[in-house]
């Protein structure tokens, strides 16, 4: 009879009894997962939720009625009427024996091991192990300590318990096969293939999947204990993919980035570029105080109020003598949605300029189809076209999703140069029913042509455009562009693109420039940027770090780094994700949303909110139904109001 509260009987579920408790679970579920559903913990080392079971550690052995011997819970699937016991005398004795064997040669490194406090061997020994060992401590086998495998990873073979996770990670997740098992039997060791250094762009995941302290981060060596860290959920700031992370900080500094599993985005993996970018957020090279730098006169640090008053006075002067169109505004793909929402309102509604952008090149007309392919949807495609882009550089973790689609789901992945004719691409696909096209922003038009060529023969053709910056997609959604308003509505008064704004400033036609946030995209402008900055009468910079813009600004207002403020960002597929403040700001200046609100008030706006990020977020969602429907963690889609 089904357990109380369980769904009705059907062929896809079975009834199982574990430690006297009945539960209904899918028939393809492992005993390990069925026990977890009841809150019953079964210790294990080799099993990992993202990898296939191998049952090599033998820690998860359980008793199953009608089976002649104990069975591994990580590799045994449930069946109807199965009765499992996880803690009888036989099971307990075997667990104690396995732990005793694992500790025979394990060093007494806990006080100096970087895994201390988050080590499964340490935890399970206390919880399930014997009170004492029958083996003498003096007979332990020793190896070289802390052998560097790369600039990021160290290996301590004395601590290795041969769970095979690292080997399987390279076999199943990345396909790079950089770590192998050497020797056989009791001589078995984990090492890099042929002793070569690790070259993978995803090696930083190794210490996270290692259940002990055998593989550790060199950057985190002897830095902290987990109980001394303050953990904050965030989003990786290195690219537009939107990998979820935990930011661990201590003593007002970021100590490490740790993956935070989101199966719809990152599948719990991080790239090394993102994981090891955290030292940049501890940099002492910061803009800390407001300052004014008149074209003639002496630069000086001032109060925030004086800096904003000076900025508004300079902007009003340009508007009065020329017009609002004599002001150019630059946003940044590093800013939050809330900041970008206010910036485009400030530009269009208060200053009166259509000249606003966050990039240099013109933004071509948007096709709603660019938003249809979600990251998780990649696995459901029969064929994938990677068009003229290198995910390894633009969005590294995307390559792991492509590998999974190809090697676990059977999809065919075609990497195609941007110049290949659309009909040739269609011929290569060969009539696959479900097709995904992945391109970067420079190849959007070609991606559209390929989609049209494939549309007649495929049941579905969906596209994903890789944007630049942590919030490049958000900047476009929210209208930080010269030719479209928020929600991709066509502007009745289109302005100049970023490069054209700089050209006009260098020619003396644009007299004032307002910059919000660091903007690496401007570096491609070369000396044009410097000529524009020198020629402009007023340059207002709200920024976090010294830059060429800050160097030539007439008014500088400190900004908050992405780890120092709350808000939201939108990833490459349109997923709106919340970020939280992890560190105290390096400046006493309030967050950019409050600075922009105050500046708008100085320029004559009367209907703006307080600048509180939550209030700005509410106003933004009220104006954009797609963002309101997306909520926190959903996708903002612009195809007939659909939201996934």
Residue map of PLM features:
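N-terminal leader/propeptide and maturation segments of large enzyme subunits in energy/redox metabolism
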Residues: 108-140, 146, 583-639
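Terminal leader/tail segments of proteins
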Residues: 2-15
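Short beta-alpha connecting loops at secondary-structure transitions
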Residues: 16-17, 80-87, 191-195, 558-560, ...
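A basic, amphipathic helix-loop patch mediating RNA/tRNA/ribosome contacts
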Residues: 31-65
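Short, structural beta-strand-to-alpha-helix junction motif
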Residues: 29-33, 61, 336, 497, ...
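Short, contiguous acidic and Ser/Thr-rich linear segments
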Residues: 21-29
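Catalytic alpha/large subunits of respiratory electron-transfer oxidoreductases
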Residues: 103, 107, 156-158, 162-163, ...
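Fe-S ferredoxin-like electron-transfer domains
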Residues: 2-4, 58-237, 241-245, 250-253, ...
């Amino acid at each position: 009879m089904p357990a109380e509260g369980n769904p009705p009987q059907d062929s896809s579920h079975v009834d199982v009894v574990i430690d006297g408790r009945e539960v209904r679970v899918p028939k393809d579920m492992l005993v390990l997962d069925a026990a977890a559903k009841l809150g019953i913990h079964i210790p294990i080392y080799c099993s990992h939720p993202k990898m296939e079971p191998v049952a090599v550690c033998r820690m998860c052995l359980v008793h199953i009625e009608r089976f002649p011997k104990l069975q591994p819970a990580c590799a045994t699937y449930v069946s109807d009427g199965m009765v499992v016991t996880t803690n009888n005398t036989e099971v307990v004795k075997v667990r104690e024996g396995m732990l005793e064997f694992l500790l025979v040669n394990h060093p007494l490194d806990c006080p100096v091991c970087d895994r201390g406090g988050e080590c499964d061997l340490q935890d399970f020994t206390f919880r399930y192990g014997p009170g004492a060992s029958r083996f003498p401590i003096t007979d332990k086998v020793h190896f070289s300590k802390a052998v560097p495998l790369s600039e990021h990873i160290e290996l301590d073979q004395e601590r290795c318990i041969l769970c095979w996770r690292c080997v399987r990670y390279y076999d199943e997740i990345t396909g790079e096969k950089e770590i192998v098992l050497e020797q056989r039997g009791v001589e078995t060791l984990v090492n890099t293939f042929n002793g070569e250094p690790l070259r993978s762009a995803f090696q930083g995941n190794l210490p996270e999947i290692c259940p002990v302290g055998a593989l550790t981060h060199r950057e985190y060596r002897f830095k902290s204990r987990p109980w001394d860290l303050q953990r904050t959920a965030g989003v990786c700031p290195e690219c537009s993919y939107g990998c979820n992370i935990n930011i661990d900080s201590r003593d007002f500094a970021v100590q490490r980035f740790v993956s935070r599993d989101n199966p719809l985005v990152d599948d719990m993996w991080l790239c090394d570029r993102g994981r090891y970018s955290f030292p940049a957020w501890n940099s002492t090279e910061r803009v800390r105080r407001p300052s004014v730098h008149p074209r003639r006169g002496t630069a000086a640090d001032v109060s925030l109020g004086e800096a904003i008053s000076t900025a508004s006075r300079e902007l009003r002067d340009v508007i009065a003598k020329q017009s609002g169109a004599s002001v150019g505004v630059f946003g940044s793909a590093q800013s939050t949605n809330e900041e970008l929402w206010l910036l485009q309102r400030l530009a269009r509604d208060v200053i009166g300029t259509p000249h606003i952008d966050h990039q240099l090149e013109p933004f071509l007309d948007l096709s709603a189809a660019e938003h249809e392919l979600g990251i998780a949807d990649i696995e459901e495609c029969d064929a994938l076209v990677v068009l003229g882009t290198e995910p390894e550089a633009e969005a590294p973790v995307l390559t792991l999703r492509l590998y999974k689609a190809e090697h676990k789901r059977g999809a065919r992945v075609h990497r195609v140069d941007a110049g290949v004719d659309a009909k040739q691409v269609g011929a290569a696909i060969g009539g696959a029913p479900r097709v995904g096209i992945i391109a970067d922003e420079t190849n959007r038009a070609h991606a559209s042509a390929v989609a049209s060529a494939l549309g007649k023969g495929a049941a579905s053709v969906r596209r994903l455009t890789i944007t630049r910056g942590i919030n490049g997609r958000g900047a476009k959604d929210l209208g930080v562009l010269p030719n479209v308003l928020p929600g991709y509505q066509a502007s009745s008064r289109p302005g100049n693109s970023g490069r054209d704004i700089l050209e006009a400033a260098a020619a003396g036609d644009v007299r004032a420039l307002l910059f919000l946030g660091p903007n690496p995209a401007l570096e491609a402008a070369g000396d044009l940027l410097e000529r524009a900055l020198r020629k402009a009468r007023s340059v207002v910079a709200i920024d976090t770090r010294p830059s060429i813009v800050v160097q030539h600004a007439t008014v500088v207002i400190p900004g908050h780094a992405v780890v120092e403020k709350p808000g939201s960002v939108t990833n490459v597929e349109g997923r709106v994700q919340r970020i939280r403040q992890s560190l105290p700001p390096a400046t006493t200046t309030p967050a950019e949303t409050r600075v922009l609100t105050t500046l708008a008030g100085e320029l004559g706006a009367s209907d703006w909110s307080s600048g509180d990020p939550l209030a700005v977020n509410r106003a933004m969602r009220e104006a954009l139904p797609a963002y309101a429907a997306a909520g926190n963690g959903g996708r903002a889609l612009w195809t007939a109001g659909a939201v996934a």
